[in-house]
Amino acid sequence: MNLFSNAINLAPAAGNAQPIRPVKDGYFITSPLDSTAPFPAVNKPLLISTVAHEAGFAVHGAFPDPLPEAAFQPICNATFGSSRAPVVVSSPNYAPVSLPDGSVDARTQLQVVGTDYLWRCSSWTFARNWVQNGGAAYVGQYLVGASYPGNNAVSFCTGAGIVCHQDDIEIVVCIFLQ
């Protein structure tokens, strides 16, 4: 558990509390999965998809009540470390969004940050590397999903127009089973 807790201090790419972190072990994973080294030649096609609100379940599950805007930076500090958080916090991609009543709920920003950080950026980087090295990648983002069992435990995930993590599974699996 000590390694898990200190991962953010050991590797610049590691975030705080990431449960799964694939590593180049020379046996199962023989080359980096990011852009830090030349990618091996490939020829298999891949389907890589994400959903619009990947981090919605995690963020709204951890914080069921609205968060004040003042909570955004400390949560980013805890996730990315104090040296990297300012880049995220100052990005126009994660600017505060006013709700209809004029208030700001930091969960909105955190959901976008989480979706980008853990799903979208890593998927797109991997797809780009795959294609640049001979493979084909079909990349998509689901804007409509099929609510995955269990996602109803977080009210955000049951909202109109919301597609949370795993809401693509039954669609993708059914396509391949037919």
Predicted segment positions?
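Substrate-access "cap/lid" subdomains that shape
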Residues: 1-67, 71, 109-132
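Generic low-polarity alpha-helical segments
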Residues: 1-2, 77, 169, 178
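Alpha-helix boundary/capping residues
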Residues: 8, 79, 92-94, 176
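Alpha/beta-hydrolase fold catalytic core
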Residues: 19, 81-133, 137-144
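Active-site rim elements
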Residues: 33-34, 101-117, 155-159, 176-178
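N-terminal leader/propeptide and maturation segments of large enzyme subunits in energy/redox metabolism
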Residues: 63-85, 89-92
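Mobile gating loops/cap/lid regions near enzyme active sites that modulate substrate access
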Residues: 121-124, 128-178
